Swiss-Prot record:
Gene name of the encoded protein: YPTM1
Disulfide cysteine pairs (residue numbers): none
Domain of life: Eukaryota
Organism: Zea mays
Task of the protein: Protein transport. Probably involved in vesicular traffic.
Name of the protein in question: GTP-binding protein YPTM1
Length: 208
């Protein structure tokens, strides 16, 4: 791949607006937090390199706007993504209810092999919780994706979320490569008669 990194993974952050996607990314990429972070217009991305199981992984993380009017812009960015993190706000039930719509978009636009992770952000606001952890866990199990609760403000599980996603993608790629190496080559065995015999047979058929 490169002397600087072993893998390059494209990740997407999706979810409703105001669930904290930009702050979530800012915490991971720059280890900083801003209360008055300006809402993303369209898309933005940051890059960070991490170590995963002895390999250097370069992450290109796209922060997509959650507003409905931007979905036509962001749909093209699903293609080529290795991993997608779906973010909701634990204090906003509607953002959790809309997770299904975001998963439907992934099914529509992303590759079948894309890895997914469900993240309940703003877990530091437990007193305002609207989505029980057990409810989110049950839903994640139902749809077959991992789940974490995070806080960009308090830096809770943010690093873990991206590292878990990176490890899952790396494992998936390694499995695909191993399966490819085990797959027998598609060699077609063809049986035929010597050309001389075919020519002799052909000449007899044409003789009158």
């Amino acid at each position: 791949m490169s002397n600087e990194f072993d893998y390059l993974f494209k990740l997407l952050l999706i979810g409703d607006s105001s669930v904290g996607k930009s702050c979530f990314l800012l915490r991971f990429a720059d280890d900083s937090y801003v209360d008055s972070y300006i809402s993303t217009i369209g898309v933005d991305f940051k890059i960070r390199t991490v170590e995963v199981e002895g390999k250097t992984v370069k992450l290109q993380i796209w922060d997509t706007a959650g507003q409905e009017r931007f979905r036509t812009i962001t749909s093209s960015y699903y293609r080529g993504a290795h991993g997608i993190i779906i973010v909701y706000d634990i204090t906003d039930m509607e953002s959790f209810n809309n997770v299904k719509q975001w998963l439907d978009e992934i099914d529509r636009y992303a590759n079948d092999s894309v890895r997914k992770l469900l993240v309940g952000n703003k877990c530091d606001l437990a007193e305002n919780r609207a989505v029980d952890t057990s409810v989110a866990q049950a839903y994640a199990q139902e749809v077959g994706i991992p789940f974490l609760e995070t806080s960009a403000k308090e830096s809770i599980n943010v690093e873990e979320a991206f590292l878990a996603m990176s490890a899952a993608i790396k494992k998936s790629k390694a499995g695909s490569q191993a399966a490819l190496e085990r797959k027998p080559s598609n060699v077609v065995q063809m049986k035929g008669r010597p050309i001389q015999q075919e020519q002799q047979k052909s000449s007899r058929c044409c003789s009158t």
